[in-house]
């Protein structure tokens, strides 16, 4: 199936759903060679992935994932996993926003990995903050129940990705797997804040999310940043069931003066972790403001706020009341099995 799919993609043709699924099945089971995988991913990138292809790939990956079964609880499960690859070198904004949103009462099931192309992935910074990435299923359940947030480490929940690692590293370009990460949450998150670095993905992903059954999502692209930006305008596509809304957000709408992207730089993992600690300890400035705005979106998607303005207020309260800092400490201790 992989050879037939490769030939079709090289010819510039989109794959039928069944053929796309068959190709991904070959990859996930180790039936495809590194040469075939590398060629297939490169050809797909050159052709441009179609929504039907991406949805089929994601469905197969979900089947091969180690699922996280959520026990009880009320409200939506929200993920703040972006595609990464924006090369902006910012601190890990989505992780800070996830912790703040959890402190505001949103149930966060953050799916992520170590950095592939940026300086610091969500797994890297959480580990630096003290979170145990090698959690047992019981520890994962405990972190969600007690902290309101769990980190689902991609390396644990997607063991079949080992078949792709070598080819991805060798070709060294963004591939469809950068897109698939946020679409394959092991908990089946029903709401997502999904950051993308390329405006073209704003058109690709809405029908994919609808096909996969996501209830509510915001796909955001902040001038090449895969977050809601405070440096420039952010293009947003909001998916609510069958409805798709497109609009632009600016920092000025929320009373935030535009910042220079340099003010959001994270450097290495130690610096990024220190910035997040500072935000949770109540430090002001550009890093706090962009965290508030992205946390606001997660709070809105989680159904705790009627709009982003209310979300910003709730995010600020989460930090200023100390709830967000307590959330991080609870996440750390429960991930280690200490409570």
Swiss-Prot record:
Function: Catalyzes the transfer of the phosphoribosyl group of 5-phosphorylribose-1-pyrophosphate (PRPP) to anthranilate to yield N-(5'-phosphoribosyl)-anthranilate (PRA).
BP GO annotations: L-tryptophan biosynthetic process
Protein name as it appears in the record: Anthranilate phosphoribosyltransferase
Annotated binding of anthranilate 1, by residue: 82, 113
Cofactor binding description: Binds 2 magnesium ions per monomer.
Pathway(s) of this molecule: Amino-acid biosynthesis; L-tryptophan biosynthesis; L-tryptophan from chorismate: step 2/5
Catalytic activity annotation: N-(5-phospho-beta-D-ribosyl)anthranilate + diphosphate = 5-phospho-alpha-D-ribose 1-diphosphate + anthranilate
One term under GO cellular component: cytosol
Originating organism: Methanosphaerula palustris (strain ATCC BAA-1556 / DSM 19958 / E1-9c)
Entries under Gene3D superfamilies matching the protein: Nucleoside phosphorylase/phosphoribosyltransferase catalytic domain, Transferase, Pyrimidine Nucleoside Phosphorylase, Chain C
Highest taxon, organism lineage: Archaea
Residues binding 5-phospho-alpha-D-ribose 1-diphosphate, per UniProt: 82, 85-86, 90, 92-95, 110-118, 122
Subunit-structure text: Homodimer.
HAMAP family given in the database record: TrpD
Residues annotated as binding anthranilate 2: 168
Gene from which the chain derives: trpD
Lineage: Archaea, Methanobacteriati, Methanobacteriota, Stenosarchaea group, Methanomicrobia
